[in-house]
């Protein structure tokens, strides 16, 4: 099955598409980077105050957990790059997207998990640090890198043009994300918004 997924003609033969399929890849690459917003700093920063309240941590403790999770995730990104080279962008984007979603669900229940272990700042710190590790690794790291690299395989002559076009939409999305997430938190609550 894995061998079949890695083939260029799965799930359909792109040579039969009546236009250059690289333009579809441009759209998907842009979406892949935008989907990584929860793993980016500007995506997680909106949840700082709700997480402080829910976990009972100080701002410094939450910041240290974020830092440790970020540094820890960076140590594994070279291994993810090797997996990208081995399995290809399609599989890495799919797996990292699913893993990012699971890590966001994990973060939404970190205070409840901490409560199962008696609560307190230690378990809250450990669980949110693991959550930060996951969203930084799968979102900011693997998903963003894989989405960027997938596009480069499709374009040679127009690589600068498509990279800059993608950059415009990504910048626009990244600038709107904190406002949209803050609105979702205000309308519902932080757990609902993080899902």
Task: Please place each PLM-identified region on the residue numbering.
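Structural signature of the two symmetry-related core transmembrane helices
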Residues: 91-106
């Amino acid at each position: 099955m894995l061998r079949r997924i890695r083939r260029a003609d799965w799930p359909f033969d792109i040579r039969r598409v009546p236009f250059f399929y690289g333009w579809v890849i441009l759209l998907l690459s842009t979406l892949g980077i935008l989907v990584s917003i929860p793993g980016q700093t500007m995506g997680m920063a909106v949840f700082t105050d709700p997480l402080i309240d829910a976990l009972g941590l100080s701002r410094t403790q939450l910041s240290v957990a974020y830092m440790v999770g970020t540094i820890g995730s960076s140590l594994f990104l070279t291994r993810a790059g090797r997996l990208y080279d081995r399995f290809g962008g399609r599989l890495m984007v799919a797996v990292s997207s699913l893993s990012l979603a699971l890590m966001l669900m994990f973060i939404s229940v970190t205070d409840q998990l901490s409560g199962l272990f008696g609560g307190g700042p230690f378990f809250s710190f450990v669980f949110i640090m693991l959550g930060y590790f996951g969203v930084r690794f799968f979102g900011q790291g693997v998903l963003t890198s894989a989405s960027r690299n997938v596009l480069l395989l499709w374009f040679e002559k127009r690589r600068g043009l498509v990279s800059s076009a993608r950059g415009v939409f990504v910048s626009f999305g990244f600038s709107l994300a904190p406002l949209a997430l803050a609105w979702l938190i205000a309308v519902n609550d932080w757990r609902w918004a993080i899902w």
